[in-house]
Amino acid sequence: MKIIISLLVFLIFNFGYSQEKTSLSGYVSSEKKGVSDARVFLIGTKYTTQTDSLGNYSIADIAEGNYKVQIVADGFQTLKKNITVKSNENIILDFELSNTENQLNEVVVSGTLKAVKRLESAVPVEVYSPIFFKKNPTASIYEALQNVNGVRPQLNCGVCNTGDIHINGLEGPYTLVLIDGMPIVSSLSTVYGLSGIPNSLVERIEIVKGPASSLYGSEAVGGLINIITKNPTNAPLFSADVFSTSWLETNIDLGVKLNVGKKATALLGLNYFKYNQKIDNDNDGFTDISLSDRISLFQKWTFERKENRLFTIAARGVYEDRFGGDVHWEKKHRGRDEIYGESIYTKRAELIGSYQLPFQEKLMLSFSGNVHFQDSRYGTTSYIANQKIGFLQLTWDKKIGKNDLLTGIATRYNYYDDNTLATSKLGTNNPEKTWLPGIFIQDEITLTEKHKLLLGMRYDYNSFHGSILTPRIAYKWKLDDNNIIRLNAGTGFRVVNLFTEDHAALTGAREIIIANNLKPEQSINANLNYIKKINFDNGTFIGIETSFFHTRFSNKIVSDYDTDPNQIIYDNINGYAISQGISTNIDFNFPNGLKIITGASLLDNKNVENGRKETPFLTEKFTATWSISYKIQAIDLNVDYTGNVYSPMQLPLLSALDPRAPESPWYSLQNIQFTYSGLQHFEFYAGIKNLLNFLPKQNNPFLIARTNDPFDKNVTYDTNGQVLATPENPYGLTFDTTYVYGPNQGIRSFFGLRYTLK
């Protein structure tokens, strides 16, 4: 009997032992940092878990068998790995994740001046990494922004191709451009603030659509673009990115990291762009796009200090020689009336820095300064401008219970001088010198785990216009981990400088009339934002973000092109202006590596005066963007298909006889790129831009009016100053460069390579 009992115990023990289950554990990281809240699961089973705050995970009691482990985390590429589970085996499996352009968990600073996860911020901030911009390589960030929903680079001149950035249909001057959070990009230099920074040195770009005046001052009326440069500590030892197009546009980006002693790290960047081909495919005798010779040097230092306190300082210098005009123009014709040309020399220097004061409290001193010199000739019209801006700010960051406080004092000095009437008084030179001291306070209150309220107030004193008060309120409701609602509202105040903001005021093609003493513009804005995250069991991720926005302007300054075709009349609107609409972005990440980013904006912009509503020139009502990417793993080839589409825009005509179309057509700019990454440290890429070969001249006899007589020597006027139609001038036109809404560059190929040594 004892033998039978012993045998039964032995059999039961061995049966239980053979059925003993095993475990799977490990560490999920990215760039040597743990990734929290990543989903770890065995596909097709009930075994699933999430990583903790340090990136660790563990799944227990797994039965024997073959499984496929999948890791899914917001903002990172999905990973899969086959495993075989055997009895009585504890498997340790670590994963290293790579970033994707879905950056919902990205840390942002632009919304509140504090480093916070994007999903935790009460202010909606869009984040774009270099991965996003590499899908359609460009020579400047200005051009790259054409792939961002609701953001449109707008050319302002068909000859020299200067432009600005429109956010949600608002003109460029309503957008504040920052570098590392510093407002060093002035109205004279918006385009140059987005040119000359090597893409390899950009950590990310943050975009806030809507009011940000309570933190950044009165210029942030329509939104802001904050270019965050790399921390030298995390930058690669050496990086290079070189590409050229079939138009022989050549761009070179170089970056080098240097360790100086034991406590300092420097990052040196060089950007060089050259295009010197006088191409005239539209046969109007003028260059299709402007020629440019631009070089930019950038250096950033970071210093190691006690208690991990911050100290960074950066400097940048830019020089550009830009030309557009008659293909027969030479340097000797600059400023003369034999052959028309627009020649712009630009010199620019910038200095920015942040220093955390050595106190127990978190006190941050930030400073920036820039000088910008522009020497231009628009035909015989000379425009020579000099602008200097200094900025100093001290902030105190303090948490008290449920209150996360940020308060600060700031002062900004703006010196502006040019050779126009804008800076002359009684026949003598009178440079514009503006002081703008201010104080602000912001309190982000955590009402509950799911509800946050942000209150902000800023007071500035403009030495010309007196007191400026800009309040702000934001509310965030986190319904759950996958659904977030934000409501933001605020006001704005902006002083306009016509000669730095409106290129048409400089060309000399039309006479400038300022009807009255222009008052500063004021605005009030509201924005409702909703984020939805959808995670599927198979690893598919869908992110949806929708915003409703409304801005109402008073004292808006409008340009009247219609009253007199030979004049531009500027005046404050006798009424109000509205900018409103809806914008949606949708991200798709599929387990097979397919990624789709798409967005669309429906815009309604109107000037309301004396009960009459008018849509401003060059303002689209609908725009959409997309990016489709797929990597063929077997051959290390990545395919990127990007594009955008714009609805018709009203365009300025010179007269009733003007044969050009009063509206632009629906048009789309589409691109494709192939990137090979099979060699260590190297990437080779090639593709085609403007696949549909769209050109704005399509269905138009010409774009630039009277290129055969740019100095209007053969124009005949009546006694009232109106242009007469003559056999030589059958449409009664004068020389005009303002009829431009898109790039005048057709289909073209490109090829480039990248080298990165970490």
Regions found by a protein language model. Give the residues of each.
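Short, acidic, small-residue-rich periplasmic hinge/interaction motif at the N-terminus
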Residues: 27-33, 37-43, 72-76, 86, ...
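Short acidic/polar hinge/loop motifs at secondary-structure boundaries
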Residues: 60-61, 166, 182-209, 297, ...
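N-terminal periplasmic accessory domains that precede
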Residues: 91-95, 141-144, 163-166, 192-198, ...
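Membrane-embedded beta-barrel scaffold of Gram-negative outer-membrane proteins
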Residues: 263, 364-376, 478, 486, ...
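Flexible loop and strand-edge segments within Gram-negative outer membrane beta-barrel domains
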Residues: 275-296, 302-363, 369-388
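C-terminal beta-signal and adjacent terminal beta-strands/loops
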Residues: 645-652, 676-758
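Extracytoplasmic beta-strand/coil segments of soluble accessory domains associated
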Residues: 142-183, 203
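Gram-negative outer-membrane beta-barrel transporters
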Residues: 446-450, 543-552, 572-653, 754-756
